[in-house]
Amino acid sequence: MHWAKILGVGIGAAALLGLGIILGHFAIPKATEPLASSVSDSQDLDLAILDSVMGQLDASRIRENLRELSKEPHVATSARDEALVQLLLGRWKDSASGLDTAKTYEYTVLLSFPSTEQPNSVEVVGPNGTVFHSFQPFEKNLTGEQAEPNVLQPYAAYAPPGTPKGPLVYANRGSEDDFKKLEAEGINLKGTIALTRYGSVGRGAKAINAARHGVVGVLVYTDPGDINDGKSLPNETFPNSWGLPPSGVERGSYYEYFGDPLTPYLPAHPVSFRLDPHNISGFPPIPTQPIGFEDAKNLLCNLNGTSAPDSWQGALGCEYKLGPGFEPNGNFPAGSEVKVSVYNRLELRNSSNVLGIIQGAVEPDRYVIYGNHRDSWVHGAVDPSSGTAVLLEISRVLGTLLKKGTWRPRRSIIFASWGAEEFGLIGSTEFTEEFLSKLQERTVTYINVDISVFSNATLRAQGTPPVQSVIFSATKEISAPGSSGLSIYDNWIRYTNRSSPVYGLVPSMGTLGAGSDYASFIHFLGITSMDLAYTYDRSKTSARIYPTYHTAFDTFDYVEKFLDPGFSSHQAVARTAGSVLLRLSDSLFLPLNVSDYSETLQSFLQAAQENLGALLESHNISLGPLVTAVEKFKAAAAALNQHILTLQKSSPDPLQVRMVNDQLMLLERAFLNPRAFPEERYYSHVLWAPNTASVATFPGLANAYARAQEINSGAEAWAEVERQLSIAVMALEGAAATLQPVTDL
């Protein structure tokens, strides 16, 4: 994920100087021709252009993009990954459909790879070292693609090398509570190997939690009950259905943070300070290896010990037990242990981001950024190439209009292809670190389309509250795939909805965690962000994600046969993302509704009052200032909306428009406090930092309150609750001040 430089424009220097606009540092060349014949300061969204773009977005072209992008494995920094860099550059420099400029930006980052000379292994060994069972080092070759030479062995990226051996225990999801449960059952975890399943806590957290309790090695598998609705037989899974085959193994980064591990808060350039590798935090402390559920079954169905709790049971066709060790009448002799051999190595590699830029005609120094990562663990047809295929089609259509001279956006559009996302959002994070000030000053919104199609039932949108209105407006005008005759909006509301006190029944939008490249934009820079995709009907499957996620079975044929035959859902995402992009880049007034934050804040406040209020009161901590701050924000947001409506009915001065748009753009930054969560790297957003408590309220307040409730917590813990309450109050007051008339101080 990465970005570049921007230069000036050549359309009326006086007007540009009057607005104080230069595009700056992102590689837009100086214009040698007029940008567009019809450009004016009052340029607004052209509905005819919008309709034209919607009509030109072609499902068959998206299909061909995906076929090309996913035909070979392209892990970050591989030869194929670099070939795709050149493909993107070629498309964005094309004489008929290219953009104003395209450029690469390179960072030297620390990645983790399995050894090619000594593959990782998992074995069941007897007391004398006899190997009774060896696990599959690679997934089974079911369609030919799994045996290609560049398919990486399944591994846990950033797990340390080592060859621990010990009796096996089953630790469910590998949470802290899970390990405490095992100890409460009288199981001595020191020197054991823990078998865990994906879900509940992050990959790396499983190993961190395990090591804290004396475990020396960790195995991780995907249970068919979590991904296949219980189906586990070969004839029930890929290539016969969308289900994960028994040998399928989910790869992934086990690094707990995001960005280059050696250069936190600094771009990974050769001259940047780097940590000593021994001082890196966030890596798994013990050897860890993912395995398929076929191999996990051999372990779980032979374990000794007491039965696991009902909530720990899965779908492998046997009763899960806790261990330690194997049952005496099972497949393995008494005293057999599990040996985990990990030979991963750390390497410094050069990873590229690619930026394609369309220079804005009126406000070139205001950026609407559309990003998708390029790298995958194997072929990556779904993750991420479904998103890259859509990105290339949107940029082709807009580039064609640009080259014909019939359109140029009001604001600059930046298309970004991020590198090394799978290792921890590295490309996008390095980019935001390098251009922090510029991006905070100039970026209107960040649109992320990582996986564009999980499946073909309905839209899934995540984002901060101000983007709700522009997504709703776009989806009401686009037909949903299929023959229902519904709009994407009306189809969406059938699958997932909520009751809004303002709007009534509306589609449900999710919030943004740190699962893709929007993370550094929203949490670190405070840039209004969203993520768009099509997904499955959750009433028909309990799968936590599409089943072949991060495996060698995520291929073009998998997409075409099981996820989106005809590619109409890909086209629907292209139209949705393209419409949102145009509305944000071309509308005179930014289509961001700050009042939609009022609902969120009121909900947070109500949760705090109902769940925290009584105990806070007993510690002489009042929520009164928070109530006042929420009301102040709501009033300021409503007043700004009314001011915008008034301006829209008149012929506003360009500077009036600019001032209002800056208020809309900068609102999200007002919620940043870099000192609020010192234990959370990159998390500065007071409303969207990780909430580890059970109460859906202001995360800092919720987390501090939960810690203060713990046994033996003292005055210091309650002082932190007061501090977090003050942080929330001041963030809301600062946000309200941002929305008030600019002359009010």
UniProtKB/Swiss-Prot annotation:
InterPro entries: PA_dom_sf, PA_domain, Peptidase_M28, Peptidase_M28B, TFR-like_dimer_dom, TFR-like_dimer_dom_sf. Residues 29-745 are extracellular. It is found in: Apical cell membrane. The keyword Transferase does not apply. The chain crosses the membrane at residues 7-28. GO terms for biological process: peptide catabolic process; proteolysis. It is an enzyme of class 3 (hydrolase). Disulfide bonds join C301-C318. Its main location: membrane. This is Aminopeptidase NAALADL1. It comes from Rattus norvegicus. The gene is Naaladl1.
